């Protein structure tokens, strides 16, 4: 009998399919019970893609000054959000997370080039690693903004944000930010 670890002891990451081939290499679905690696991948530049995607989401949620360092609280909120997602959609919440990341990551961005003292915006394709990082940042920013001075818990706000991003709902903060960034890039072509 082969025993595979499930994330939080409930959800099997081996059932999850990354449909966006561009980010497949950068979304780690390694089976772990508790997504907490203690930062062992922080020494090398691109090793963050080896960390479980659930842990990277939790790390991004700890960005605000009130949540800094409270990883157990954040992991509990992520687990509760996954329970809410499972109740609402009847799907594996890790699949919803992966779909949300694929939908919320901008494909095109703007860089500023200097030509003789004049800065000119130019549209460029976004690297897959940066797409994943930006999508996680937008999802966590949307969650924190929705939960700030609200009666709703962080878990409820995270579940709403992930479901909205997975369904490409424009009311979702992350999809809205992605569309705005791509709109600026389209104008700079």
From Swiss-Prot:
GO terms for biological process: translation. The keyword Ribonucleoprotein applies. It comes from the Archaea. GO terms for cellular component: small ribosomal subunit. Pfam families: Ribosomal_S7. Keywords: Ribonucleoprotein, Ribosomal protein, RNA-binding, rRNA-binding. Coiled coil: none annotated. GO terms for molecular function: rRNA binding; structural constituent of ribosome. The keyword Ribosomal protein applies. One of the primary rRNA binding proteins, it binds directly to 16S rRNA where it nucleates assembly of the head domain of the 30S subunit. Is located at the subunit interface close to the decoding center. Part of the 30S ribosomal subunit. PANTHER family: RIBOSOMAL PROTEIN S7 (PTHR11205). Belongs to the universal ribosomal protein uS7 family. This is Small ribosomal subunit protein uS7. It comes from Methanosarcina mazei (strain ATCC BAA-159 / DSM 3647 / Goe1 / Go1 / JCM 11833 / OCM 88).
């Amino acid at each position: 009998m082969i025993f595979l670890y499930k994330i939080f002891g409930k959800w099997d990451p081996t059932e999850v399919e990354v449909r966006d081939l561009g980010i497949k290499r950068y979304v780690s679905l390694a089976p772990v019970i508790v997504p907490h690696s203690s930062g062992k991948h922080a020494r090398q530049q691109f090793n963050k893609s080896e960390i479980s995607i659930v842990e990277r989401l939790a790390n991004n949620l700890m960005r605000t000054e009130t949540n800094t360092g409270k990883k157990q609280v954040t992991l509990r909120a992520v687990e509760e959000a996954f329970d809410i997602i499972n109740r609402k959609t009847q799907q594996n919440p890790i699949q919803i997370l992966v779909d949300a990341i694929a939908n919320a990551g901008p494909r095109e961005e703007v860089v500023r080039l200097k030509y003789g003292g004049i800065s000119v915006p130019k549209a460029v394709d976004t690297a897959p690693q940066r797409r994943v990082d930006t999508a996680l940042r937008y999802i966590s920013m949307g969650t924190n903004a929705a939960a700030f001075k609200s009666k709703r818990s962080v878990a409820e706000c995270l579940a709403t944000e992930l479901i909205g991003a997975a369904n490409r709902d424009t009311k979702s903060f992350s999809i809205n930010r992605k569309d705005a960034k791509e709109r600026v890039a389209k104008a700079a072509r």
